[in-house]
Amino acid sequence: MKRSLFVLFVVLLVLSLNTAAAAQEKDRSIRTRTKGLQKLDGYMPLYWDAENGKLLLEIERFNAEFLYQVSLPTGVGSNPIGLDRGQLGSTNVVFFERTGQKVLLVRPNYRYRAITNDPQERRAVEESFARSVLWGFKVEASEDARVLVDATAFFMRDAHGVVETLRRANQGRFQLDESRSSFYLARTKNFPQNTEVETQLTFTGDEPGRLVRETVPTPQALTVRQHHSLVALPDAGYKPRRLDPRVGVMGVEFYDYASPITEPIEQRWINRHRLQKRDPAAAVSEPVKPIIYYVDSGAPEPIRRALIEGASWWNEAFEAAGFKNAFQVKLLPPDADPMDVRYNMINWVHRSTRGWSYGSSVEDPRTGEIIKGNVTLGSLRVRQDFLLGTGMIPPYTSGGARHGGDAFCELGMVFGGDDDYLTQNSSTDAAAMSVARIRQLSAHEVGHTLGLAHNFAASTYDGRASVMDYPAPMVEIKNGKLDFSNAYGRGVGTYDKFAIRYAYAQFAPGADEAAELERLLEDGTARGMLFISDADARPPGAAHPLANLWDNGADPVAMLRHEMEVRRIGLAQFGLANIPRGTPLSMLEAKLLPLYLHHRYQLQAAVKSVGGLYYTYAVKTGAGANPARVQEIVAPARQREALNAVLDTLRPESLVIPPRILALIPPRAFGYEGGTGEYFENRADPAFDPIAAATVAADIAILPLVEPHRAARLNGFHALNPANPDFKQILDALVGRTWLEPAPRDAYHAAIARAVQSLTVTRLMDTAANADAAPQVRAATTQTLRALQ
């Protein structure tokens, strides 16, 4: 009897345990775990647990790749820091991998791959290089093939790297404060092909840097929003296109270990949007799906229209490539989220100081396909151009009212409602010039998001061949007066059409695409489509005479003389009429600075002919080198002409600021110590320092002449052809202009001459002491210094 009772007890115990286990297992189902939670259905279902402030993520696609993108919907507002509204962060191809009760978010290594149908060959490459596990999730519940994870910590972390960005900018040591951070549900949404999650993060620090103190209301607590996008990757219908250095289309680079031994292992594919003809056989066809860009509705008029118009110029280039109505620009709908990857965006971004605009993209790292174009345009750019214009041509009477009307807010013509006035584009209208610049800037940054790189040679041919150059305002001189009528161009240029054709042209069915692309390239180079980009234009010792930033014209030396004359005329008429009534006179300095240095970029362009080397990104073709003109040292006479033009800018009469202007600029007015204005270096504070201003202008000429790379080239080119000047000849000319000419009789001019002499010696000493300079360069510089003793 006891034995029977014991057996019965054991059976009942087992049954109860099984029942409890079954109930527990039922409780671990997704349905049970998410009961009462708000569900956001879509690509990856989300569940919002309002009571606990948690966000749960449902996963059913394992080992299936998708795109993970981080961005910054709100910014800090300081350009030097670089955390701007709308800024894109890292773009990663990732997948979920489950092991038991853990789910890993894995980033595969697409820099090294094997493009082959052999799975074992692909596996060998995958296992040879490390991958990255970005996050690990604990399974909260499961149901069939689906699992539920708590993604709160994943989304609430500093994924954009705000802490590290602040540290690199020397703005203090911050850390994420979870107690002051939360999900931003208004921008947390789900769609069939993308899941969007936004958070509000607060970073705290005890010793914030100056830039943080200037822009954040409570500098010890910096709050921004961070956005996460989980996006389905494009389907397999996209066809990559090879990168060619003869045309400036950016791309992705990777190593293909399955390539034949006779072929390069390095592969380069261009970045471009997916664009297909509706009728592939037609010369010009509507697209299957157009490329649509949306303009930030926060941009005011007339800026908004300028942004739309400038970006719309690209439709002309797409028409030249065989597409009709393929590129469109619209205003972002009020209910649309600009961080949604489905929208190509043109963002209007405010900062405390002026700074760069950007054209960036969300790209598929596997193919180079552009999924989202994202433009960031700094709002202070238009004000800077207005400052330049009103500094060159006085728009006010000496009493303070604008010529032809009453006094008004200086930027009223830009941000007021007088649309008819803004479209007049008169020869002296700084506002019209500023809006024209915004059109061009919109086109330029959108061009980057279409895949195009900078072309810093484009300003030298075909009357502004590309919007992808940096444009200086083309200020003309008509009847002795400055004229803004042609300050900035309209529309894309010949090079832009050439580049878009290479990137997007779709050839007739059955055509040999590689042969068609080569034919297109050879035709473009034959028509003079010269492309030279950043690496060959920006360095202080850059050699290409035609690759320059903020320059104009085919002849850099002639344009330097022109810009010096523009500067002379501007200074001759500079005075009270350059500022509106009610403005402190000390603010004249902010307008004087860009006028006084008006020639600086053209000077940098002209000096590149000294020790200059013309070259192209030529490649070998079946017919030989293309372009046929591979490289050519700038002619000796041309080098000397450029040198003389550069040295002319060092004459005291070129550096002096007229005393009548100095008399108008008192120390900084009370209440105007801060602001966005930019001013000269000053060693005579609080008084304006004309000697320091002259030193700054002189250094623009002296520094590049003694730059070590340029100096070494001069010696090398002289060895190849003694007719070319060597570095010693450049030094002799520099010293002759700054030290050996008779001292000016005027005391003011003489003081400037002495400042230039001192600067010359300082720069010579820098070069002589530069351990990276060639021995011959250091020796020549040392010899010159000794001769001055």
Description of each model-found segment:
Residues 1-4:
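Positively charged n-region of N-terminal signal peptides that target proteins for export
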Residues 7-16:
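Bacterial N-terminal signal peptides
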Residues 24-299, 317, 331-429:
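Auxiliary tRNA-acceptor-end handling modules of aminoacyl-tRNA synthetases
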Residues 64, 298-326:
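Zn2+-dependent metallopeptidase catalytic core
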Residues 299-303, 424-442:
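Short pre-active-site segment immediately N-terminal to the catalytic Zn-binding motif
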Residues 312-323, 351, 447-448, 452, ...:
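Sec-exported extracytoplasmic/periplasmic mature domains
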Residues 331-350, 436-490:
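The catalytic-center signature of Zn2+-dependent metalloproteases
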Residues 428-429, 433, 459-789:
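Conserved catalytic/binding loops enriched for acidic/polar residues
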